[in-house]
Amino acid sequence: MKYELTATEARVIGCLLEKQVTTPEQYPLSVNGVVTACNQKTNREPVMNLTEQEVQEQLDNLVKRHFLRTVSGFGNRVTKYEQRFCNSEFGDLKLSAAEVALVTTLLLRGAQTPGELRSRASRMHEFSDMAEVESTLERLASREDGPYVVRLAREPGKRESRYMHLFCGDVDELSLQTSAPESASGDLQSRVEALESEVAELKQRLDSLLAHLGE
């Protein structure tokens, strides 16, 4: 597979994929928009505190690698960025809406169970049931041009196995296990996090609207 992203590159691409679906009126994103999305405290694991300079360096690298492209339309003085990571006109990686939702959530939060993914990806795609989540994960894991995700060994005491994306290379399961947050009520936590993300995005939309009205 030709994808070998750093953790920060994965965060940038994940943010652009997410905002393309959840806040299309604000997409493509400016550098400031990408910084805000990367450092968002909801629906991010781990939470990052990237500077504008750090994000700009990642954007420049990803443009050179043809994973992003710059957009500067007529009358638009601010350079904006859109993803060419998947489903672009000349790109090779074609994903369904369900696959985009799962890949994005894995890029933004790392290894997760199917139950967590269903809840956290719901703003991008409404999965009808757990079977749809699991079948989508299996397709991503068995694609001829992939695999793009891998099923991890089930941890002791856990009911579900977690899945991880492979866009940053092979997975070190030991480090993932030691860094995995402990939660006795993971499904409830996932639903709360999804609601927090919706509130954060509504606030972001309101701030953007107020700023636009004040111009």
Curated annotation (Swiss-Prot):
It comes from the Bacteria. It holds the Pfam family DUF480. InterPro entries: DUF480, WH-like_DNA-bd_sf, WH_DNA-bd_sf. Coiled coil: none annotated. SUPFAM superfamilies: Winged helix' DNA-binding domain (SSF46785). Belongs to the UPF0502 family. This is UPF0502 protein YceH.
